[in-house]
Amino acid sequence: MRRIKVKISYATAVIMGIKKGKLNFEMPTAYLMIGEKCIYNCSFCAQAREAQSDKNHLSRITWPEISYDEFIKSFNPEKFKRICLQVVSSKDYDKELDKILEFLKDKDILISVSIRPKNEQEVERLFEKYNIDNMGISIDVPEKSLFEKIRGTKYNKYMEILINSSKKFLHKITTHVIVGLGETDLDIVKFILGMKKNYISVSLFAFTPIEGTKYENLEKPSLERYRKIQYAKDIIDNNEVKIEEFKFDNKGNLKELPSYHVNKEEAIKTSGCTWCTRPYYNDSPNKTFYNIPKVRTFKEG
């Protein structure tokens, strides 16, 4: 096993005192990345096996690398509400993840792990051994044929792990959808509705083209389209609604939302675990944000 290195988001590094800088957004979650150069080959990912991207990037975020020893020396859980571990499926990632979680498990901080689990047993082991609060099992691509093309694995098997994990760990499993990978609005709305039935929370991302990836020349989704998906998600999250109440054209584009109240200020905030803001993950500082980096309203306890 290689000597353990930990990558931390630049904003996390500023709060930890490792980097200098000023933050103009809420940042109650520490973001870490474990592993490097994935064994998988997702077309959009900077860490994909064949990607020629900067190894210190995930999406558009820079992740400064520090040693494990420097991390445990510098990390103060009192500065954060939650810590989120982004796990790259590289060789020996499980040993590196175990070491980090062993250090964190007795700290007074919520722990999230975002991972591509090998099987349900891996999910169960991480929850039971390390008392993690949440696990993100990212589908990314909600349409079956596109998923298998872009992510290179069987959709049904992955969905089985996702749904069965939620049955074992109710309200503790999240998944991600990346808007703009060729799917339709209908695909996304159907998926979010299906996840709600399985008590799985969906986090939305806007596709971000990264230099050196297979999809480096694919365009980002329009902000108008992304807002419609955010509003649709808000309606689904807060109401008992059916797919028939959404109006789509014959190409699967969302044309009309159901007649429910939408809290637009809340709907466009970053979606994810409690305390998650993911600043600039798929947003440029000088452009209108897809996801506003503010903490969503929730009930503590």
Regions found by a protein language model. Name each.
Residues M1-P28, P77, K190-G301:
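Auxiliary Fe-S-binding modules of radical SAM enzymes
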Residues W63, I150-K157, E183, D187, ...:
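Alpha-helix N-cap and loop-to-helix initiation/capping positions
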